[in-house]
Structures are given as C-alpha cells and as structure tokens.
Design a protein with these regions (language model features):
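Extreme N-terminal starter segment of soluble prokaryotic enzymes
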Residues: 1-7, 33-34
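Switch II (G3) loop of P-loop NTPases
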Residues: 92, 96-120
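Generic beta-sheet signal
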Residues: 4-8, 104-108, 135
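Glycine-rich phosphate-binding P-loop
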Residues: 7-21
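Conserved catalytic-core segment of NTP-binding enzymes
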Residues: 14, 30, 43, 111-195
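N-terminal phosphate/diphosphate-binding loop that engages ATP/GTP or pyrophosphate donors
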Residues: 19-86, 90, 95-98
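General beta-strand structural signal in soluble alpha/beta enzymes
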Residues: 36-39, 63-66, 106-110, 137, ...
Length: 202
C-alpha cells in the first residue's frame, strides 16, 4: 500500500513548519506507524533537518532526509545557483518517492512559502501535483494571516486540492488578531480544516 504523504507547506518562511512537522511525525510514530520524515530543500543550515530527524529517532546521515542543502540563507533556487548546482523536479520527485516507498507515513516538509522557487521552474505546488499528498498549510497566528492563508488556499485549490488542513501556530506574545483569525478563516474558507496550536517555541 502506498504511503500516506503529509506535505507541510507554509505561507512564509519561519512560520513553524518544522515544529509542526516534527510534532506530527512524533505523534504518528507513537501511534505505531512506520514513519519517515523528509525536507528535500534546506538553505542556511540544517537545524530544521536535525529537529525532524530527532522527532522519529533517526540517527543516520542527514543527506537521507535532506539531499539538497545549501549554505546561503535564501530561496533554494538562488542558493543552488550560488553554488553552481541545478536541482530539477525529477530529482526531487525521485527522492520523495524513494523515501515514501519505505514508509507507511511520510511527513514531507517544504521550504519557504508555498510559491517560493525550489529549483529550476518549480515550487511546492508542482510537487503536490506530482504526488498524492494531503497538504497542510502552516501559518503564524498574527495580523495579516487571514489574507496569507486565503491566498495560499486559493492557489492550492487551483492545483486541484479540496481537502486542505490549515494550522495556525501561536505567537510567543499573542496579538489582538490572534483571537479572531481562526474564526474568520473558517468563515471564508468553509471547506478547509482549520486548527490552532499554542506557542511551541521555534
């Protein structure tokens, strides 16, 4: 049976994708599932990859989780070009399918925002179109998030996805809008499954 793939994407960088991905992977593993984690692209260090690895007790080579790692803290496309490297969608999908073949559940974490360029002429929506995955959109529960989430949902729906999870990650110091954002998103996007989590660090 093919693995269930949970593709965790974000409205932006630094919104809590890694924290949520690690939490989801840990929960799935605790429930007895054979879980793999993967973050194909990472720029500016591998701290996020290490957190993912720890969530499932992985102690092997991080290249097996994160094959496309770059030094420069910019979008993966720009970072790859700065190192004279080219990453194609075929390269990416070959990696994703290989990891998925070894798991019951794969928690796949994207990089940056939903439309951030990952490689030559592709982004996270192209990966979603190439695999059967449940997209989970992560965003910070702060002012402006309603617009960001609705724009991202519109793009995901345009790509053919109608069952989308949305997770709003709490801020260390909650903002005034934090108490109403979930309700407004549910009202404006009734088909999305919207959840909120408290501040979890990161």
């Amino acid at each position: 049976m093919p693995a269930r793939i949970f593709f965790v994407v974000g409205t932006d960088t630094g919104v809590g994708k890694t924290v949520f991905s690690a939490l989801l992977a840990y929960h799935l593993k605790r429930s007895g599932r054979r879980v793999k984690v993967a973050k194909p692209f990472c720029s500016g260090g591998r701290e996020d990859v290490t957190i993912l690895a720890q969530s499932v007790g992985f102690e092997g080579n991080l290249d097996l989780i994160n094959p496309f790692s770059f030094a420069l803290p910019v979008s993966p496309l720009v970072a790859a070009r700065s190192e004279g490297r080219v990453v194609s969608l075929d390269d990416t999908m070959g990696f994703v399918r290989s990891v998925a073949s070894e798991a019951e559940d794969l928690v796949l974490e994207g990089a940056g925002g939903l439309l951030s360029p990952l490689g030559e002429c592709f982004d996270s929506t192209d990966i979603l179109e190439a695999i059967e995955a449940d997209p989970i959109l992560v965003a910070k529960n702060r002012i402006g998030v309603v617009n960001q989430v609705l724009l991202s949902l519109r793009e995901l729906e345009r790509s053919g996805h109608t069952s989308i999870g949305v997770v709003l990650m709490g801020e260390e110091i909650p903002e005034e809008s934090g108490s109403s954002n979930v309700g407004v998103i549910r009202e404006c996007a009734p088909t999305a499954r919207v959840f909120e989590l408290p501040y979890l660090g990161g």
